[in-house]
């Protein structure tokens, strides 16, 4: 094992010990990187590109739990649902009629916590209404995902992570708060993240 991989495994083990799960974002990874972490015992992997999701589910072990974390186009719902276990980036109620055709799919509601018009996600003021629609369609929803703008200040991220955690705490049947990436996972964990999304950090962990 090289030092980068050893350090990454230590990081993952420490997160597990603290009660935080990790979805390994393999967007920029070679197939060999995926298998290296698979062989170390990790099973949650995230893809944002549909073609790669399809290709990798075809060549990797079937016990990998694939998460889709990219933008969702209506015409791609079938492809995503056939190859992923969880969609972390659900952000449009108009997708529900197609999602209900795939009873095994699970979703997380992506929150547009910044409220910026150019950001994906459900606005905070619309969350309750969207949850009602999800329940009407009998879609399995496990919680929320949030991804604040990367150029946000630490203080701004603290505020947004805190606000997201308060929203999460209102829904006691939800178990997953996907919050924190390679850039800000430590901060997100201070505010109650249960799932981090780490990619490049694990390949460059000196």
Q: Predicted regions span which residues?
A:
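Expand to "…catalyze enediolate/carbanion chemistry for C-C bond making/breaking, isomerization
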Residues: 189-190, 197-204
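Conserved alpha/beta-domain cores
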Residues: 1-183, 191
């Amino acid at each position: 094992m090289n030092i980068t991989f050893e350090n990454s495994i230590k990081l993952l083990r420490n997160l597990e010990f603290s009660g935080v799960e990790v979805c390994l974002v393999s967007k920029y990874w070679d197939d060999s990187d995926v298998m290296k972490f698979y062989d170390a015992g990790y099973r949650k992997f995230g893809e944002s590109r549909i073609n790669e999701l399809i290709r990798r589910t075809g060549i990797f072990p079937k016990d990998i739990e694939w998460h889709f974390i990219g933008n969702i186009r209506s015409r791609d719902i079938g492809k995503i649902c056939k190859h992923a276990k969880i969609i972390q980036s659900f952000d449009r109620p108009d997708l529900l009629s197609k999602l209900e055709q795939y009873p095994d799919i699970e979703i997380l509601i992506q929150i547009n916590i910044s409220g910026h018009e150019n950001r994906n996600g459900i606005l905070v003021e619309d969350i309750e209404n969207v949850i009602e629609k999800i329940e009407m369609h009998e879609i399995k929803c496990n919680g929320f995902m949030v991804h604040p703008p990367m150029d946000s200040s630490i203080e701004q991220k603290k505020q947004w992570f805190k606000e997201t955690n308060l929203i999460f705490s209102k829904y006691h049947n939800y178990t997953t708060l996907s919050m924190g990436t390679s850039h800000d996972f430590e901060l997100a964990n201070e505010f109650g993240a249960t799932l981090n999304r780490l990619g490049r950090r694990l390949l460059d962990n000196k």
